[in-house]
UniProtKB/Swiss-Prot annotation:
Biased composition, class Basic and acidic residues, residue ranges: 134-148, 189-206, 244-270, 278-303
PANTHER family for this protein: FAS-BINDING FACTOR 1 (PTHR33689:SF1)
Phylogenetic classification of the source organism: Eukaryota, Metazoa, Chordata, Craniata, Vertebrata
Domain of life according to the entry: Eukaryota
Pfam family, one: FBF1
Organism of origin: Gallus gallus
Protein name per the record: Fas-binding factor 1 homolog
Name of the encoding gene: FBF1
Length: 1132
């Protein structure tokens, strides 16, 4: 919540707590004004002022700045070190005040100078911390109550009103000193206040003249001891003060003085001296006077009655008790009251009771009588004049003149009233000057707490004359509008503080020590005046006490146990003097009470209107915020739904497209596989057919070749047999041999031709096989390349599919993360809402506990005051009954005000919570909007990615189409290759046919050769026969040689014939010629056999060549078989 709203709420709570603590049924809120009227008045004015500042100071326009200031303040630790030290120091001072512990008297002199400094220090501490540490840290209510008692300057800084409008209807209800005090030190501040009062009095028309009877410093101190003056201190310590902005407070206190003169007027009307306030005030920002607005003041003719009877029933003014360092104690005021009433002084154990002669008589007289307006004339005959009391009387008269100088524009009537009062005092002093000497000595010797009113009438005639002169000077100074000159003299007298050490602790503040009494002292002295009001024994004495002259009566009653002889006489004279003034004063007070009641009703009406307007503003704000939040939520919900639908559509499209691509890929792969399978099957079939053909052809050729070899072997064997069986004895074989030679030469040429043709055909077949193998290898390479291309395309398609699936999984994961993040943010928001509700509940509980503690403190104070009141005499009971009646009315009004303030607090807390929730909701909406923008950007990027994926799929489709085209081209090439292979097959068939034809030719040739061989066999048989015949002839010839050895020529011829025949035969059949048995011709036979042997070797060599050729052909065929078997699986 904004700090300004908190400050205004704290100001209103200050008044409530003042009511709870200060306005008990027997203790008035302020000492110098009636308990009911003054407290109700002050509370009404402060409440109105706080509400005015709360509702009219442009609250809603300043909320953002205040939120920034609160954030800056909250960033620092709440428990500021300076604030904690100040709190501890103030708690020590408060304990000393409560226990009556005396402190160094030098604090009296320091209070005047250190007041503003303390104020600024605590103000800075509050500004640093942003809040008072006590309420936020959960401190107990009693500790909070102690702070305002001990440190009024620190806590008074929190009271801040920002009334910049001079025409504010509540302006006249606020004290001027509350605005002007923080900017001035004590002497200067006291001098400037009369000027402001005079100016305000001139600005406001119907301002009636106020009673200047509260002219003494004791009266001022009593007013400072009231509980209500401490209200702001207590509330500031509790953390509800207005001091978060100390700089603004200094700048606006002057305006608050101008718009709040009603409190000071009421103080003057009800017996509270404004001049004493100016003198006693440390000038550190404490506002104590309550000046009534001009329209609420009485007419000049009524002022004399008011001056004579300056206090209503039930109110009183005790002597001022100055605690060390200017901090008062409420319990001291109560003890002072009990000491005065019961005539049994009970000073605190830490304070020594001084003799009555040591205290200032003038101060005591002012403390007892000036607050009732009776002055010294009513009890001049009670005691003889004392020389030690003359000078204080003069100072009290000077204070009276200062009060007149600070009063409002109707100063002439006040001067008339003062002159009449002074004349009465002079007459009483002359009549009763001889009867006063013994009573002060008696009271001081007894060690009681004598009433200052008893010593007050002891002034001499010269003192009265001085007082009259001072009053004339005050009147002239007030009419000129300048500050009174004796303020400086009063501040000069503050340099003599040793006197309080000799006095009773309850009256330790002298009139010349204005800075020694702090606003907390003035607030603490409230209960004692109430007790003094109820002291008189008769209704007449009560009326005289209400007027302003009850302190002498109170002092007489207090001295009653100690000095019974002189007291009866003084009671009689006091009653006679008080009876005359009480009657007129009662009428004036009744009229004043009616006027205050009217004013209170007006304030209530104004408060209700302001609250109603505030409630309407809050409702309007809440409704506007709700509508805005609803619209924002609807828009974001629609946007989120639209994005969700788009995302689902994109996912569906992506899924369908991916499925289509997968189906197309599967179809293409299936078609490609089918085509490859068919092509492989066809190629395998063709290769198998070629292998079968080649195998069959090679087998047939092998069979044929083996048959030919067998035939040749048979022929060779037959030839060898024929040669071996041929005889060499026939010459007719020569022709046959020649023919055989020709035949053999022809056969050799034919064999060479067959070998050449066979070699050429085999080479052609090998070349054709090699070409087919090369073609098959090329086809296999192409098929393998196509297979690799298909595998690569398949892997690429699989990679594309995997990428698409990964992208889909990533998108789903991101969506899940976003969903979880949104749920986490929602849970955080719900937890924050629950924590805020819990904090609000704890704050309400804490406030209720604090309120209960305050109620208990109030009940304790009530019990204490009741116990004191029970000890009073029978003469006060009637006045107590009247006070109780009036107090019940005040309590009713107080309760109504409390209810109003509670409602205001609730409204403030609700508004604070709503504003905080609005700010958080706005921040959350901004965060959600940013997140939605990020989601939109992500979806846009996903859409781009999907477009790219679709583009890649299109490219892949194009690639697949290109691959299909390439496959078709390869199929065409395979078809062409199959055609070429068919052509090659046909060529091979033709070559086989040629080989068959050649083989048939060879067959025919072999048949011819067989025929020739048959013929040769026949010839060999014939030759064999001839050889046999020749052998027979040779034997015959041998026989003839034996018989005829002398005929060598015949032998030679026969040998030649035989050699010729054998030579022909050996040359034909390559057999060695037969060995000649002729002894003379053995060398010729060996040569012939050698020739035959050579021929046989030649034939064997040819047979070996044929055998080697056949083996080579067989190896070639086997290699062809192996090559065909090896190429078949490759083609497959």
């Amino acid at each position: 919540m904004a700090t300004k709203s908190k400050s205004s709420v704290r100001g209103s709570i200050d008044d409530v707590l003042d009511d709870l603590l200060g306005y008990d049924d027997e203790g008035p809120a302020k000492s110098s004004q009636p308990a009911g009227v003054s407290s109700g008045r002050a509370r009404g004015s402060s409440l109105q002022a706080s509400k005015k500042s709360f509702l009219e100071d442009d609250f809603f326009s300043k909320l953002p700045a205040e939120d920034m200031e609160a954030a800056e303040g909250s960033s620092i630790s709440d428990a500021d070190p300076q604030a904690v030290l100040q709190t501890l120091k103030e708690m020590d001072d408060m304990e000393a005040d409560l226990l009556g512990m005396s402190k160094p008297s030098s604090g009296l002199g320091k209070a005047a100078t250190k007041g503003p400094g303390k104020f600024s220090t605590s103000e800075g501490a509050v500004k640093t911390s942003g809040k008072m540490p006590a309420p936020e840290k959960g401190e107990s209510a009693p500790e909070m109550d102690k702070k305002p008692l001990s440190s009024p300057p620190t806590s008074r800084q929190y009271r801040k009103f920002n009334f910049e409008d001079v025409d504010d209807p509540l302006a006249g209800l606020l004290s001027e000193e509350e605005q002007d005090a923080p900017r001035k030190p004590s002497p200067k501040g006291s001098e400037r206040r009369p000027e402001r009062k005079t100016e305000l009095g001139k600005e406001k028309d119907p301002l009636p003249p106020q009673t200047p009877l509260h002219t003494t410093a004791p009266a001022r101190r009593r007013e400072e001891l009231t509980f209500e003056d401490d209200d702001d201190d207590m509330m500031d310590v509790l953390g509800f003060g207005d001091g978060q902005k100390g700089d603004q407070k200094h700048g606006k206190k002057a305006e608050e003085e101008e718009v709040r003169p009603a409190r000071s007027k009421l103080d003057e009307l009800l017996g509270r001296g404004s001049v004493a306030k100016i003198l006693e005030r440390p000038g550190a920002g404490e506002h104590r006077e309550f000046k009534l607005d001009k329209k609420y003041q009485k007419q000049p003719e009524k002022e004399e009655g008011w001056d004579e009877e300056d206090f209503v029933f039930g109110a009183y003014q005790p002597t001022v008790a100055t605690t060390p360092e200017g901090r008062p104690s409420r319990r001291q005021s109560v003890s002072r009251f009990s000491a005065e009433n019961s005539s049994e002084p009970k000073p605190d154990p830490h304070s020594k009771p001084p003799p009555a002669a040591s205290q200032s008589p003038a101060r005591g007289s002012r403390a007892g009588g000036d607050w009732l307006g009776l002055k010294d004339e009513d009890f001049l005959d009670s005691e003889p004049p004392s020389p030690a009391k003359t000078s204080p009387v003069v100072s009290s008269q000077q204070l009276l003149a200062k009060e007149q100088a600070t009063s409002k524009p109707n100063q002439l009537e006040e001067d008339n009233w003062l002159s009449a009062a002074l004349s009465r005092k002079k007459a009483q002093a002359q009549v009763k000057a001889q009867e006063r000497g013994a009573v002060p000595l008696e009271t001081t010797g007894k060690g009681l707490d004598p009433s200052p009113a008893v010593s007050q009438p002891a002034t001499s005639t010269g003192a009265a004359a001085q007082a009259a002169a001072l009053q004339d000077k005050a009147a002239s100074a007030d009419s000129s509008g300048h500050p009174v000159p004796w303020l400086s003299t009063v501040t000069q007298t503050s340099a003599h503080p040793p006197e309080p050490a000799k006095r009773d602790p309850l009256r330790d503040v002298s009139p010349s020590d204005p800075a020694a009494s702090s606003p907390a002292e003035q607030g603490m002295q409230g209960p004692a005046p109430l007790a003094q009001v109820t002291m008189p024994s008769t209704p007449l004495q009560a009326a005289s006490q209400l007027q302003a002259e009850s302190p002498p009566l109170g002092s007489v009653h207090e001295r009653r146990p100690g000095a019974p002889t002189g007291q009866s006489y003084e009671d009689a004279t006091g009653c006679r003097a008080a009876l005359l003034s009480a009657q007129a004063r009662v009428a004036e007070l009744e009229s004043q009470v009616r006027m205050l009641e009217l004013e209170r009703t007006q304030h209530k009406l104004l408060l209700e209107s302001l609250q109603q307007r505030h409630q309407e503003d809050l409702d309007l704000l809440e409704s506007a915020h709700r509508s805005r939040v609803k619209v924002v939520e609807e828009t974001y919900g629609q946007r989120e739904e639209r994005l969700r639908r788009e995302k689902e559509q994109l996912e569906a499209q992506l899924l369908s497209q991916s499925q289509d691509a997968e189906r197309a890929r599967a179809d293409l792969v299936a078609q490609h596989k089918q085509r490859v399978a068919t092509l492989e099957q066809q190629s395998a079939q063709e290769l198998e057919r070629l292998r079968e053909l080649q195998r069959s052809s090679v087998q047939e050729m092998l069979k044929d070749h083996e048959e030919q070899l067998q035939r040749l072997k048979r022929l060779k064997d037959q030839e060898i047999d024929a040669v071996t069986s041929a005889t060499s004895h026939t010459r007719s074989l020569n022709g046959v041999i020649e023919q055989m030679e020709r035949f053999s030469s022809d056969l050799h040429s034919l064999s060479h031709k067959v070998e050449a043709t066979h070699h050429t055909t085999s080479q052609e077949l090998a070349m054709g096989a090699r070409q087919r193998d090369e073609q098959l290898k090329v086809l296999q390479d192409r098929l393998s390349q196509q297979q690799r291309d298909m595998e690569e395309e398949r892997s690429r398609l699989q990679e594309v599919i995997a990428k698409m699936e990964a992208r889909l999984s990533e998108q789903t994961r991101l969506l899940e993360q976003e969903r979880w993040r949104v749920t986490a943010v929602q849970s955080k928001v719900e937890s924050l809402q629950r924590s805020l509700e819990e904090q609000r509940r704890l704050m309400t509980q804490q406030l209720s506990m604090e309120r209960a503690e305050l109620e208990r403190a109030k009940s304790a104070l009530l019990e204490e005051q009741k116990s004191v009141m029970q000890k009073c005499s029978e003469e006060r009971r009637k006045l107590a009954v009247e006070w109780a009646e009036f107090h019940t009315q005040q309590q009713l009004s107080k309760e109504r005000m409390e209810r109003d303030i509670d409602r205001a607090l609730q409204l403030d807390s609700q508004r604070e919570g709503t504003i905080m929730s609005l700010a958080k909701e706005q921040a959350e909406l901004k965060v959600r909007s940013r997140e939605l923008k990020v989601k939109e950007e992500q979806l846009a990027r996903d859409r781009l990615l999907l477009d790219e994926a679709w583009h890649e799929l299109r490219l892949e489709k194009e690639k697949v189409k290109g691959a299909t085209l390439r496959i078709r081209q390869q199929e065409e090439e395979i078809k062409n290759m199959s055609k070429l292979s068919a052509q090659k097959y046909e060529e091979g068939e033709r070559a086989l046919q040629d080989a068959c034809r050649i083989e048939s030719e060879h067959q025919a040739r072999l048949q011819v050769m067989q025929q020739h061989l048959e013929q040769l066999k026949q010839q060999e048989q014939h030759l064999q026969q001839e050889r046999l015949s020749m052998a027979h002839q040779r034997r015959q010839l041998e026989q003839l040689h034996k018989k005829l050895p002398n005929n060598p020529t015949l032998l030679l011829t026969t040998d030649q014939d035989l050699s010729a025949s054998t030579k022909g035969l050996s040359s034909t059949l390559s057999f060695p010629p037969p060995i000649r048995t002729l002894p003379g011709h053995r060398s010729v036979g060996t040569t012939a056999s050698m020739e035959l042997y050579a021929k046989l070797l030649v034939l064997k060599h040819r047979a070996q060549q044929d055998r080697n050729f056949l083996e080579d052909e067989q190896l070639f065929l086997e290699t062809l078989k192996k090559a065909s078997y090896n190429t078949s699986p490759l083609s497959v």
